Amino acid sequence: MQERHTEQDYRALLIADTPIIDVRAPIEFEQGAMPAAINLPLMNNDERAAVGTCYKQQGSDAALALGHKLVAGEIRQQRMDAWRAACLQNPQGILCCARGGQRSHIVQSWLYAAGIDYPLVEGGYKALRQAAIQATIELAQKPIVLIGGCTGSGKTLLVQQQPNGVDLEGLARHRGSAFGRTLQPQLSQASFENLLAAEMLKTDARQDLRLWVLEDESRMIGSNHLPECLRERMTQAAIAVVEDPFEIRLERLNEEYFLRMHHDFTHAYGDEQGWQEYCEYLHHGLSAIKRRLGLQRYNELAAQLDTALTTQLTTDSTDGHLAWLVPLLKEYYDPMYRYQLEKKAEKVVFRGEWAEVAEWVKTQ
């Protein structure tokens, strides 16, 4: 039976997006997994818990016997069919369990007996996780340029267009503000960190990377937080600030938060439920900053939001949203960002409109 692995191999697996057949229980997979992993467990959560209890009370031999008893007959055959199909679909893939121990070896031996010679990750998920953490620590040491600017400045798009850019918000599946959620649920913290490590490794491998281009983010992006090693480096980084006209920012925000989000919700849920989800999304975003706005101002903006939604529903026009978006930017988001930027003014090395900043970044 094949085996792979040195420290460099773990990184190579992440860079290549090697399919990983992860045989850990679903609860383990949800807590943290590699980006290209699919979960086809040897034992489900209940079976794993029962075997774990048996191990503590009666030892490893009894636990192993119980595991074979629980995963037998039709259950074993169903799981074998799933593993066989996954192996045939992903001939360059690899098996993985928690530490490269019994679970992946058992599945590997069963597959081998069925005529499929399939490798496994020595050290399992734990080894891959440590490789991901170490890669982030090392790669974060390269110089960083941050793209700053008020809400609607097109910072994320600018980062996405750079060969040395890493879209932190895209990886976190959140745009970082009260209105930042997307239709994709956020990953667990460990899975987010693994995805970030893989993206940094792939970006670094594609070129002779001298510096990173990242968006000027706070520590938290929705429910995910940036790894401390990267966050610390970002606090020391140079900042290029996008200063686009207010009207252009409004156009971007209209496209991103009204037109696109409405489209995405209706595409996912259908017209009627999609509309309700879209309305709830906007109200939830405004409600999240109610305390900072003050109750009176919040109620005024919420009423304007309701009016704008009625107009959008009846006319398809999103223009009515300007009635609450403009004051929200001028009274809340813009002053907040300018205050934050003032605290790190000495880090600002360039200011300009979007195209000017994009051109400047290329020269770095």
From Swiss-Prot:
EC identifiers of the protein: 2.9.1.3
The keyword Transferase is assigned to this record: yes
Molecular-function annotations in GO: transferase activity, transferring alkyl or aryl (other than methyl) groups; tRNA 2-selenouridine synthase activity
Catalytic activity, as annotated: 5-methylaminomethyl-2-thiouridine(34) in tRNA + selenophosphate + (2E)-geranyl diphosphate + H2O + H(+) = 5-methylaminomethyl-2-selenouridine(34) in tRNA + (2E)-thiogeraniol + phosphate + diphosphate; 5-methylaminomethyl-2-thiouridine(34) in tRNA + (2E)-geranyl diphosphate = 5-methylaminomethyl-S-(2E)-geranyl-thiouridine(34) in tRNA + diphosphate; 5-methylaminomethyl-S-(2E)-geranyl-thiouridine(34) in tRNA + selenophosphate + H(+) = 5-methylaminomethyl-2-(Se-phospho)selenouridine(34) in tRNA + (2E)-thiogeraniol; 5-methylaminomethyl-2-(Se-phospho)selenouridine(34) in tRNA + H2O = 5-methylaminomethyl-2-selenouridine(34) in tRNA + phosphate
Active site: 97 (s-selanylcysteine intermediate)
Keyword check for Metal-binding: no
Rhodanese domain segment(s): 14-137
Primary role: Involved in the post-transcriptional modification of the uridine at the wobble position (U34) of tRNA(Lys), tRNA(Glu) and tRNA(Gln). Catalyzes the conversion of 2-thiouridine (S2U-RNA) to 2-selenouridine (Se2U-RNA). Acts in a two-step process involving geranylation of 2-thiouridine (S2U) to S-geranyl-2-thiouridine (geS2U) and subsequent selenation of the latter derivative to 2-selenouridine (Se2U) in the tRNA chain.
Protein name according to UniProt: tRNA 2-selenouridine synthase
Name of the encoding gene: selU
